[in-house]
């Protein structure tokens, strides 16, 4: 594979050489092997078009819209493609909400004094509870318990009973439109049941109906799962505030005991950092022959952590996003890999055996072949669980050192991380006016929320995302980066002050005046809800509906099921939404037309699909300029 087809990052390119030398299975070779006729991106044409189904025993079926060839049950190509998309959406929503459920569980036990955590942001607790109409006169613990009770009651509302959380948090104009479309949601559990049941054979085969149900589920997910999750994590672990963080694979020093919490849930990661910062744990590592003990942030668990807590010698840095995982594990510097929900590769046991690290599932969702030992997260036991994990890592240090030579001299960069609604307001002096003035004057043409994964489809890891974002800031468009795409920006150096040199003159001047980079590190994919709430605030201050603002969403390298429901929610919110790779719906012409054209008249949002980075940004910029013209700015 060419270097650019492997990754944008030199560190990962170098580690690929090590992996190949060691004859290890890896994501790049596996991707190439899936290609047809020696072309990595060429796959089954029916699968790529979304025109196939294997849900019942009459199948598998293939469909062809041009010939009106339907499934045995009679479903059209459009119905097939949208039904499978909705099932992906359900998986994404369910996984997002599993995280939320664990966060509420953790907040409740913390309020009872049973965890190693504390309520770090009592003001945020009271502000958020107050927004939801919860009594705020009691103690922090009492309010936290009221909050847990309130949100769980809302989660459990049936689909036919409107969600109070959505009613309170969503912008009035959006609520009105959703009610008109009959997509105002009930509780998230009821919505998941409604969507899943609709996908049964011979139930709902109408693509437009299925698309509306997907939007309804997306709205429930964003406001109930994502916003509640992130705001409650803020309450527990701190509101993100800007600070520098070491990033890239060079944060792994083989002379230290290195512990990597990996996945999407940061609970045990935070607990381990609290312990690792204590002198006695550093002494334990030194007694084992190491220079010390470090917790290294990885993927979205790591992203949750680095947004909130500052670096030091115990909480040392961040490796990268999910495609970097095998590169990290093959570095010869990992002692323990704690795998929570999401983004832990099934091949990890092979790497653990080869490179001598301890692989430990810490979520009931995660399982690996031939790995029998596990430590499922329990907030009441979190302190003891974190200590056990650190002990495992220390005890494994000598085994890892004897398992082969580590890779040295990998790069380390610095990124500015930790932007949130609150910290952006702080940077602006407590009001949105400076940002809005910059937009009105044209110094900032518009804002793009880049919520993305990373994928090998069409390009190497992060290559397309970096190209799109560089082109956006060159055209004076401010970028808020989220998800694995945020990790891409950090490791690529685009979240540092030096990035201003890539920005257009007017955006560069604004960023210099505010002391920020033109790419603001805004969190994980779960922060999509936080971003929606921020856009709602901008809409309220400007008195302009969200669909009429000079803003857009972009997912240059979406990959999995969470990403699909983020995109569907963006359409429901009324956003111009750019995605790549091409979704598996091209064999569904009516569905394609609905998403890429007709949706403008439905919600105000529209989907744009484009492989070329410059053409993609052309479309985004054209949309932004049309909105500016309509607003007279």
UniProtKB/Swiss-Prot annotation:
It catalyses: CO + 2 oxidized [2Fe-2S]-[ferredoxin] + H2O = 2 reduced [2Fe-2S]-[ferredoxin] + CO2 + 2 H(+). The keyword Iron applies. Gene3D superfamilies: 1.20.1270.30, 3.40.50.2030. Homodimer. CDD domains: CODH (cd01915). This is Carbon monoxide dehydrogenase 2. Belongs to the Ni-containing carbon monoxide dehydrogenase family. One of its GO terms (molecular function) is hydroxylamine reductase activity. The keyword Oxidoreductase applies. Keywords: 4Fe-4S, Iron, Iron-sulfur, Metal-binding, Nickel, Oxidoreductase. It comes from Methanosarcina acetivorans (strain ATCC 35395 / DSM 2834 / JCM 12185 / C2A). Cluster B is an all-cysteinyl-liganded 4Fe-4S cluster; cluster C is a mixed Ni-Fe-S cluster which is the active site of CO oxidation. Cluster D is also an all-cysteinyl-liganded 4Fe-4S cluster that bridges the two subunits of the CODH dimer.
